[in-house]
């Protein structure tokens, strides 16, 4: 057993000097709290896709006096089967590599006082048993604890997944008839949008209508999804390992791969030692696409067709769809009245192969929009208001954010996409907009295979007396003012957090060095019309980008770039001194383009 103590030197002694500890000699307060997934597997570790290789650098981000506490292979070669920590294990990024580094190092039981929800789910999908410190003391006293004690706190389906050893072995048992799904006993009730969407996808019900309520654990049929080059290699590996090298996908036509995250990483100085691994990730995505026949959105001539979330909503997310993808901003699809959110690589491997996903029906919070925004205000200001007034109080936490009301009709589809995209910054499960005439018009403009009647027939609207655990909150758009997310001050304990909102007119003059516009949130048609409006006004006033400021604008997709050229916006940007960047996610994750590597801007999404 390995105890992750606040005394980091004591961890070293366990790893390298054979020191054995007992829980009875410690208290929970002696153990590390809030172990971040970036500590368990820093970003550079994620360039490896084989979990066994990832495990060689387990906890590479845990440093003491500038030196790694866990040297390479320390956990893997330590012979540990149980790992122990304090409160909130697995905070931060939802990366699945974090629990993978433990599982493939031989860890079979993870003990903590509490777990971050997504990290707990990732452990569950891998079949990792989780317990508390009282169970650990019993184990150390020689007691045998039955599996049922490790699973008793979970819903019936999660129990089956754990007992099966993870989501992929569970899917095999389900298909063979070795296990059966417990009946969902929810009777008829008024439902909100996410409840209706989930109830219409319940596995095994056919055309029979179903009902769900918050907290219900169900399996739901997935309509489509996508992955990108940072995650596809693992998906391909997991499916090959589980089903053999000749595995096939039953319905590849509505699944896709995108080359957008690492497109510009080659040449970035800090990634130079990982170039071969990055290329392997790219190559394996190509192999996966050719093997499965999913939609191919690879770069052509070094230029990506677009950022995955933008292209997906343009080309294949339909009203009422259930879409899952390996990225947290997948919820952008909710603008099209679809249910969409991000999942880990193992979950995605299961759903793309078996066409179902585990769903714990979330609670919902409704935002009723009234009035219209003032000129100069956008949907970004609405979501920053929600972050400040609601998310900061955890009112949106793990809930579905439902947007409706007469004010929604005044927002374009691109502005609605901004609202839904940023639901993840509110720590929400997803965001969903009510459909209307604008939904129909926007989709018909982009899909020759759809008709108005087909689109309207799939509309999902809440029942009039639907219940919202988070309440219904009216937001008068006339009250919204331009805002920014405060950059924070780590020296004073103020995090860089989008809930730290500030009104622009109260900031005074703030000197800037870099201006960036783009990302999945802000690289859409309407966003570019806003940028062009500002740049054109500047040019008319005899102004350009200041000499000591670098200004970048990045297209969200090829179609956005084409529109910019047709409208003359590209010429306006160039005359104003803006640097234009082809589509990609590099700026948000610090992965290039090479001349713009200082653009490590999560604020491109949040602000």
Indicate residue ranges for each PLM-predicted region:
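Accessory "access/gating" subregions that flank catalytic or transport cores
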Residues: 306-315, 320, 426-545, 553-566, ...
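Long, structured ligand/cofactor-binding scaffold of large enzymes
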Residues: 38, 43-48, 52-53, 57, ...
């Amino acid at each position: 057993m390995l105890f992750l103590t606040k005394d980091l030197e004591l961890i070293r002694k366990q790893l390298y000097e054979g020191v054995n500890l007992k829980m009875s000699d410690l208290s929970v307060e002696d153990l590390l709290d809030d172990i971040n997934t970036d500590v368990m597997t820093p970003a550079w570790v994620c360039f490896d896709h084989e979990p066994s290789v990832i495990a060689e650098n387990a906890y590479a981000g845990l440093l003491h006096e500038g030196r790694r506490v866990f040297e390479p292979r320390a956990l893997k070669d330590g012979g540990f089967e149980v790992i122990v920590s304090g409160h909130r294990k697995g905070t931060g990024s939802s990366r699945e590599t974090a629990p993978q580094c433990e599982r493939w190092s031989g860890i079979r039981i993870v003990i903590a006082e509490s777990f971050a929800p997504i990290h707990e789910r990732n452990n569950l999908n891998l079949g990792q048993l989780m317990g508390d410190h009282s169970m650990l003391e019993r184990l150390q006293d020689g007691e045998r604890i039955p599996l049922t004690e490790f699973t008793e706190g979970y819903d019936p389906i999660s129990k089956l997944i754990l007992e099966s050893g993870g989501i992929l072995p569970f899917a095999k048992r389900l298909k063979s008839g070795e296990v059966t799904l417990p009946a969902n006993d929810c009777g008829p009730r008024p439902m909100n949008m996410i409840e209706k969407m989930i109830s219409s996808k319940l596995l095994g019900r056919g055309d029979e209508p179903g009902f769900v309520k918050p907290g219900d654990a169900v399996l739901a049929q997935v309509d489509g999804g996508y992955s990108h080059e940072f995650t596809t290699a693992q998906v391909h590996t997991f499916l090959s390992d589980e089903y053999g090298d000749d595995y096939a996908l039953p319905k590849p036509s509505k699944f896709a791969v995108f080359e957008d995250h690492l497109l510009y990483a080659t040449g970035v100085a800090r990634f130079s030692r990982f170039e071969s691994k990055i290329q392997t990730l790219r190559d394996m995505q190509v192999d996966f696409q050719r093997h499965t026949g999913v939609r191919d959105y690879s770069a052509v001539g070094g230029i990506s067709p677009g950022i995955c979330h933008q292209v997906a909503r343009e080309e294949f997310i339909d009203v009422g769809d259930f879409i899952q993808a390996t990225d947290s901003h997948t919820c952008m699809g909710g603008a099209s009245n679809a249910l969409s959110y991000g999942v880990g690589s193992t979950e995605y491997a299961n759903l793309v192969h078996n066409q179902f996903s585990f769903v714990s029906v979330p609670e919902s919070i409704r935002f009723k929009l009234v009035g219209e925004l003032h000129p100069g205000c956008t949907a970004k200001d609405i979501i920053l208001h929600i972050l400040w007034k609601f998310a900061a109080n955890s009112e949106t936490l793990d809930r579905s954010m439902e947007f409706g009301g007469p004010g929604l009709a005044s927002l374009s589809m691109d502005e609605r996409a901004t609202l839904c995209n940023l639901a993840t910054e509110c720590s929400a499960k997803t965001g969903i907009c009510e459909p209307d005439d604008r939904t129909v018009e926007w989709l018909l403009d982009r899909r020759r295979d759809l008709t108005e009647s087909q689109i309207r027939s799939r509309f999902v609207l809440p029942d009039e007396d639907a219940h919202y655990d988070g309440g219904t909150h009216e937001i008068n758009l006339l009250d919204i003012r331009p805002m920014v997310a405060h950059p924070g001050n780590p020296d004073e304990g103020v995090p860089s957090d989008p809930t730290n909102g500030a009104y622009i007119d109260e900031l005074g003059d703030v000197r800037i060095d870099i201006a960036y516009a783009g990302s999945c949130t802000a690289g859409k048609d309407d966003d570019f019309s806003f940028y062009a409006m500002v740049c054109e006004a500047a040019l008319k006033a005899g102004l350009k980008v200041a000499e000591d400021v670098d200004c970048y604008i990045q297209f969200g997709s090829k179609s956005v770039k084409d529109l910019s050229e047709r409208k003359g916006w590209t010429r306006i940007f160039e005359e104003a001194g803006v640097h234009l960047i082809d589509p990609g996610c590099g700026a948000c994750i610090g992965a290039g383009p090479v001349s713009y590597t200082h653009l490590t801007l999560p604020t491109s999404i949040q602000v």
